[in-house]
Structure formats: structure tokens, C-alpha cells
């Protein structure tokens, strides 16, 4: 059975394309594609593997299984899907949920168990500054990020989610 991603509308595709262009031009020392190890659900892994095969992208053993599954890194520590020349994601249309939701990230409230959303600080992510300053873009992106983050949280087992939530992200602040 062929796995399919939820349909995105043209406005969503345009917004993601604009974000992609901003990220590609990013010159900060921090890189979302360097050493971040985004979690991959079983469903997303199948989708990415199908995409790699369909597009004839020669990446063998694209994933690592430790406490959770994430994309393999190249010898420089970048995500194997990050094209070092173009600074683009070669699987942009099917990239991991947390990559789609960026610069929004998440944690869970230890008391309520509910997902809480955070945004990266502009000093490490120019896109975060653009998104946060434009309330309309922020709201649209929050809606998209909530869906993606809910999808990844629902798609991970408890052990994997616990491992991900241990990762410290000090350069963020909570969005109400």
C-alpha cells in the first residue's frame, strides 16, 4: 500500500517554499540541519523511503535507530538529506514533521501531559524573527506546526518520545 502525506493547499505550499528560501540563505552559526537529529515516525520513514526510491536518490541506510529513529548524518554532521552545495533539503516535500514545523518546537507539560509550543529565538533562526513579527504568518504556521507536532507525537512510542523530550532547547521561548 502506498503511503501518502496529507494534502497541502497552494497557500501552505507557498508559505513552506518562502520559508525554505529564507532557511537556505541563513548565515547564522546554528543550523537546523546540523546535529539536530529530527525524530522520524514509522509512517514518515516509509514515506521518505518511497520518495527516495521514486526520485532515484541514492541514499542507502538513510536512518539511524538509537533511542529513536532519525536521519543519518554525513561526515560533517549534517543531515544526510541536506545538500551541502545548494543548502536545500533534497526531500523537502516529505521532510520530517519537526522540520516542517520549524522554527516552532515543542515540549510536554509534565503536570497536564499537554503539548506546549515554543519558538526559536531570532538570534539562532532568522525565520523565527520573520514568523513571530507577522501575526498572520505566525498563526498560519502555528496551525500547521500543531498538526505536524501532533502527528509526530502520536507516531512515536513512549520510549522514543521520552528520549526526544530530554533534548534541551534553551534558545526558545514558549508561545501562548
Regions found by a protein language model. Give the residues of each.
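Short loop/turn segments that flank or connect secondary-structure elements
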Residues: 1-176
Amino acid at each position: 500500500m502506498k503511503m501518502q502525506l496529507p494534502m497541502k493547499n497552494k497557500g501552505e505550499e507557498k508559505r513552506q517554499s518562502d520559508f525554505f528560501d529564507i532557511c537556505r540563505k541563513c548565515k547564522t552559526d546554528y543550523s537546523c540541519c546540523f546535529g539536530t537529529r529530527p525524530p522520524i515516525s514509522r509512517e514518515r520513514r516509509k514515506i521518505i523511503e518511497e520518495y527516495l526510491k521514486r526520485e532515484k536518490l541514492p541514499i542507502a541506510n538513510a536512518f539511524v535507530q538509537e533511542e529513536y529513529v532519525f536521519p543519518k548524518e554525513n561526515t560533517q554532521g549534517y543531515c544526510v538529506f541536506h545538500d551541502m552545495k545548494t543548502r536545500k533539503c533534497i526531500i523537502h516535500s516529505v521532510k520530517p514533521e519537526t522540520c516542517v514545523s520549524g522554527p516552532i518546537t515543542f515540549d510536554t507539560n509534565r503536570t497536564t501531559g499537554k503539548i506546549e509550543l515554543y519558538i526559536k529565538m531570532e538570534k539562532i533562526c532568522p525565520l523565527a524573527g520573520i514568523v513571530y513579527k507577522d501575526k498572520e504568518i505566525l498563526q498560519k504556521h502555528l496551525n500547521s506546526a500543531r498538526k505536524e507536532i501532533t502527528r509526530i507525537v502520536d507516531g512515536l512510542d513512549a520510549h522514543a518520545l521520552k528520549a526526544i523530550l530530554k533534548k534541551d532547547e534553551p534558545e526558545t521561548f514558549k508561545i501562548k
